[in-house]
Amino acid sequence: MFTDLPRDLETEILSRVPATSLQKLKPTCKRWYTLFKDPEFLKKHVGRAEREVISLMSLRVYSLSVNLSGIHSSVEMTGMLNSLKDSEDVKISDITECNGLLLCTTDDSRLVVWNPYTGETRWIPYKSNSPYEMYQKFVLGYDNTNKSRYSYKILRCYHGLIDFGYEFEIYEFNSHSWRRFYDNSPNCSFESKGVTLKGNTYWFASDTEGRHIILRFDFATERFGRLSLLYQSGGYVDNVVETGVLSAVREEKLALLYERFDELNDSSEMKIWVTNTKIVEAKDLSWSDFLVVDSSKFMVTRMTNVMSFLVDEEKKMVVVCDTDIDQHMNRFYIVGEDIYKEVYKDIAQGWFSYWPLLISYAPSLVQIQQGKVIPGGKRKR
């Protein structure tokens, strides 16, 4: 026990202890039990937690062991994460991560927030008001204006019935309810999964002319905004396919994996950029080159349908997850200046909504705000 330590120093030390150890310490000290529920402490702990890697594969969530050691680099599945509480067979088709919480869309179009470390869940009801559910997106974020306590929200984007434009809804955990809002500023197409960083969500997107942009949704103001890219996209070009995917780097920066494939010349290039400053400090984005992959050097043409990737800045390597539609295979690659190694391959199941994902995840004790209890003992959801 740290009974002789100043309270601030004790808190500082405990904020650096892994979540697995904190969970064991909770029942040993009433003061610590209270501290481990304090939002400000949890915020500090999540920011310092050592991140783990999980993967969504074949409608299940797996923990991964990633070894980045040159020619001995590997990715191994170490086990399936425990099933969601109160459900024996939940199949998950999509995941977004925020502060150690996973927002999961199930195979039967239900929505649940899950802390896989504590096992806590909260099912979120929503009413489908569009026949185009296949094209809807959910992301989890928070209003970060209150530095001591985050106000979590869910953004739902879906195709409307008029001109197939996007419509938007917000779910607030504080009020336990959905509401629609209107914002015409996006006027673009989402080209990648959303990545939540410091409470806000970012997408690689393209405008009506095919020019690429970074789109940000601010959960505090509930407004979209456009941010700068390192390169200028010239719009649609015949026989040229350009794709981009975003990833978070140590919960501080954004990384962009960009691929350009020339179908006429059967050539491709892959570039990865990382933002120069921490997201919380930047009003706009400035980028630096991180990695350029010479496809001809490794005798590969291109990756196909890259859905997610993870960056190791120190080793200057990335782990990439993609799907080969022609061969109907899911694949993991480790890519660096001198390595391009396939480390995992498996038969893909289902359509694109079932494609695999790599997620950097920080085990945390963050609690999920539950719905109000109504007469009869059931929670209002």
Curated annotation (Swiss-Prot):
It comes from the Eukaryota. It holds the Pfam family FBA_1. Residues 1-45 form the F-box domain. Kelch repeats lie at residues 151-199, 229-281, 331-379. InterPro entries: F-box-assoc_dom_typ1, F-box-assoc_interact_dom, F-box-like_dom_sf, F-box_dom, SCF_F-box_component. Keywords: Kelch repeat, Repeat. NCBIfam families: F_box_assoc_1. PANTHER family: BNACNNG10540D PROTEIN (PTHR31672), F-BOX PROTEIN CPR30-LIKE (PTHR31672:SF13). This is Putative F-box/kelch-repeat protein At3g17570. It comes from Arabidopsis thaliana (Mouse-ear cress). The lineage of its organism: Eukaryota, Viridiplantae, Streptophyta, Embryophyta, Tracheophyta.
